[in-house]
Amino acid sequence: MIGAGPVGLFAAYFAHLHGLKTVILESLNEPGGQPEMLYPFKKILDIPVFNEITAADLTKRLLANLTDQDLVTGHKVSQLEKTDEFVIDGEYQVRSIIVATGNGAFKAKKFPLKATPEAEDHIHYFFKNPDLFAGQKIGIFGGGDTALDWAQELSQIADVTLVHRRDQFRGMESSVENLKADQKVTLKTPYLPKSMQVEKGQLEISLKMVGGDEVTQETFDQILVAYGFRADNRFVSKWGVDLDQGLIAVDRSMQTSVPGIYAIGDSCGYPGRVPVIGIGFGEAQIAVNAIMQDLFPEKSLTIHSTSI
């Protein structure tokens, strides 16, 4: 299993239910993937059974399901050799591979203004503990789900201004409605940052109205940048795996163009796919069942846990 985000962790658990021995390789230093890295406090609302659950609690529950699976963190997969089986980085010999890397290796898109080392200390691209910003004046730059979630979370403990280059936000409809109803968040739209300097331990940022000449000045103790991430799953192309618009192409069994290599979650793409965790959980079951049928064609496979 390559990737220890929610979908990868669930796939490892489901593989265990079928008696498969699994090793999970994760490039980050801790499991949980992008949800745990970017917004562990976020309430996830679209996972069946839970009316809401935080990313951190979801990770804890998924980890609690693991028993004899080996979890290796801080290991970025680079090499793959194919003989009768697969050999990963000259160390792990496996019969099948499931790629569950989400958007792959990701780097935050940087704040567009040149920052001195002193200014960099006030610029953040992710955080785990909201209390670090309590009582401060916070600027959040971005207009997607992450920016909206951060704004609503921090508005409970800080003075928050959300700056976006458009009047419309890209987040989920319910998040946009909640934001507009949250009188604790000051909205600055449509504005882009024009210049920045540090004065008396704070960031002074000039904001220019998009399509106009108006320039305003804002002072922040800290800013959070949610301009998205540059994702990269191209490492699998070195293995001969086909990509489609940057995503791993799969068939109906979640198998890639290379027999024995499967892809699930946001790492893969096919017509009509929706990038939500719940879909990834279903894809994990499809991939594991396909692997079982490939490795043990003589077995009568129990498809689901409620089979009689």
Swiss-Prot record:
<feature type="binding site">
    <location>
        <position position="306"/>
    </location>
    <ligand>
        <name>FAD</name>
    </ligand>
</feature>
<dbReference type="GO" id="GO:0050660">
    <property type="term" value="F:flavin adenine dinucleotide binding"/>
</dbReference>
<keyword id="KW-0560">Oxidoreductase</keyword>
<dbReference type="InterPro" id="IPR022890">
    <property type="entry name" value="Fd--NADP_Rdtase_type_2"/>
</dbReference>
<keyword id="KW-0521">NADP</keyword>
<dbReference type="InterPro" id="IPR050097">
    <property type="entry name" value="Ferredoxin-NADP_redctase_2"/>
</dbReference>
<dbReference type="InterPro" id="IPR036188">
    <property type="entry name" value="FAD/NAD-bd_sf"/>
</dbReference>
<keyword id="KW-0274">FAD</keyword>
<dbReference type="GO" id="GO:0004324">
    <property type="term" value="F:ferredoxin-NADP+ reductase activity"/>
</dbReference>
<keyword id="KW-0285">Flavoprotein</keyword>
<feature type="binding site">
    <location>
        <position position="26"/>
    </location>
    <ligand>
        <name>FAD</name>
    </ligand>
</feature>
<comment type="similarity">
    <text>Belongs to the ferredoxin--NADP reductase type 2 family.</text>
</comment>
<comment type="subunit">
    <text>Homodimer.</text>
</comment>
<feature type="binding site">
    <location>
        <position position="106"/>
    </location>
    <ligand>
        <name>FAD</name>
    </ligand>
</feature>
<feature type="binding site">
    <location>
        <position position="266"/>
    </location>
    <ligand>
        <name>FAD</name>
    </ligand>
</feature>
<protein>
    <recommendedName>
        <fullName>Ferredoxin--NADP reductase</fullName>
        <ecNumber>1.18.1.2</ecNumber>
    </recommendedName>
</protein>
<feature type="binding site">
    <location>
        <position position="77"/>
    </location>
    <ligand>
        <name>FAD</name>
    </ligand>
</feature>
<dbReference type="GO" id="GO:0050661">
    <property type="term" value="F:NADP binding"/>
</dbReference>
<dbReference type="InterPro" id="IPR023753">
    <property type="entry name" value="FAD/NAD-binding_dom"/>
</dbReference>
<feature type="binding site">
    <location>
        <position position="39"/>
    </location>
    <ligand>
        <name>FAD</name>
    </ligand>
</feature>
<feature type="binding site">
    <location>
        <position position="34"/>
    </location>
    <ligand>
        <name>FAD</name>
    </ligand>
</feature>
<dbReference type="Pfam" id="PF07992">
    <property type="entry name" value="Pyr_redox_2"/>
</dbReference>
